């Protein structure tokens, strides 16, 4: 019986990882920004659980984008993400796709060079089915680089202590 359960779990796991947005889901906020790609950072596992480092999925490969302008922001729920201010950073995980996110996002980021400008739209959903959790799928498209690029914020947090919403 246990072998059957593990076999079924192994067959279903890839479907869950690259799945569409779970339903029902409530849209809490939408944030569209023009940003400049800076770099990709490897963030190792911090070894905080018994599953670490082999089976925990804590390690991240983060693409870092600096926000230039905020084109569109709409908060439809009480707990939606805040508006991204010019000079702030947006991180996109390159190792794991969010549910509802196109697989082309990682392909496009892999082609980017530091200084390339993109339009990033982050939709903040809250899944309200049997399990309740946030989902933030990202869409990215190339745009022309704007002339006025704000400097980096001085109070940017250190990369190794910044929490990720996952």
Model-derived features with residue positions:
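N-terminal low-complexity, Pro/Thr/Ser-rich intrinsically disordered segments
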Residues: 21-38, 42, 149-166
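Structural detector for short beta-strands of small beta-barrel domains
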Residues: 27-76
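Acidic Ser/Thr/Pro-rich low-complexity disordered segments
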Residues: 70-89
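Short nucleic-acid-contacting surface segments enriched for D/E, G, S/T with interspersed K/R
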Residues: 100-121
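OB-fold/S1-family single-stranded nucleic acid-binding modules
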Residues: 124-156
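Short, structured beta-strand/loop micro-motifs enriched in basic residues and often containing a Trp
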Residues: 88-104
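Hydrophobic h-region of N-terminal signal peptides that target proteins for export
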Residues: 5-19
């Amino acid at each position: 019986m246990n072998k059957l359960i593990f076999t079924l779990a192994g067959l279903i796991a890839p479907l869950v990882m690259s799945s569409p947005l779970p339903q029902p889901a409530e849209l809490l906020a939408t944030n569209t920004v023009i940003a400049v790609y800076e770099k990709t950072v490897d963030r190792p596992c911090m070894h905080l659980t018994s599953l670490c480092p082999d089976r925990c999925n804590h390690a991240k490969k983060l693409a870092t984008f600096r926000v230039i302008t905020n084109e569109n922001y709409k908060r439809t729920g009480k707990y939606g993400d805040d508006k991204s201010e010019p000079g702030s950073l947006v991180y996109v995980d390159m190792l794991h796709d969010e549910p509802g996110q196109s697989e082309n996002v990682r392909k496009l980021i892999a082609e980017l060079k530091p200084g390339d400008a993109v339009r990033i739209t982050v939709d903040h959903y809250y899944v309200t089915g049997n399990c309740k959790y946030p989902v933030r799928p990202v869409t990215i498209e190339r745009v022309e680089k704007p002339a006025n690029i704000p400097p980096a914020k001085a109070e940017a947090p250190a990369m190794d202590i910044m929490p990720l919403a996952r």
